[in-house]
Amino acid sequence: MNKKYLPSALIMYLNYFIHGVGCSILGQAVIKEALAAAWGVEAMAITAISAALGLGRLIALPFAGPLSDKLGRRISTAIGSASYAVYLIGLAFAFSSGQNGGYQIAYVCAIIGGISNSFLDTGIYPAVAEIISSAPGVATMGIKFFIAIAQMLLPFVLGVAVTTTATGMVSYNPLFIGCGIIYAVLFVLIFLFPLPDSEQKAGGKSEGLIASLKHTNFSFESIAMIVIGFTCTGT
């Protein structure tokens, strides 16, 4: 790996470290209870917000990949980071809104969070594989490693981030806002360091988005991989 790409790789992995928190927070019982109390709904209703993450991901998947190939890994990752910041800070705003539309705001923000997930996947996975081209398998395993570390630390972070509002309600807004701010910082940093695909694009003309979509072909093996991906993340 070229050492000049080391900061870029770290930025990519940090995106997924915070993603490990963002994709897990709505599954935490204490956060479900806090959000349900703020919005005046049953804790089970928070499951619909979690499902909106999947909906947003499905919405973005058909075009996130071609856009990443056309515009570059940097732009795709930047879209993902910015969208994730909107999702997390939006959750804090939704909590503060309470029963005055808070649940609906959270649902929309969760869809945006799902969209950001697709753009992070299509930007960061190929980016780290291109950076660590001699061991792309290790590069993608690093993504799972950072997610796992974040999820392992999340219970401890919840104990630190919890606060109480003026009305006596339990709030995890510091966690939402803090992670959102980190994503905003990562959004800026992604433009400051080099990526291999940016230099390659400077030396040649890439295929257009429409042409790329026309050449898309799903083989039996690719469909099988999609099914495996769906079931393994669903469990």
Where would I find each of the regions flagged by the language model?
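Pair of pore-lining "gating" transmembrane helices in MFS-fold secondary transporters
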Residues: N2-Q28, N217-G234
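Juxtamembrane helix-start elements in MFS-like secondary transporters
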Residues: V41-S50, G102, A106, T140
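Residue-level signature of mid-helix packing/kink "hotspots" within the transmembrane helices
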Residues: L53-P62, M152
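Conserved MFS/SLC helix-loop-helix module at the cytosolic interface between two early adjacent transmembrane helices
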Residues: I59-Q99
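Cytoplasmic helix-loop-helix junction between adjacent transmembrane helices
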Residues: C109-F145
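Flexible cytoplasmic inter-helical loops of multi-pass small-molecule transporters
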Residues: L192-A211
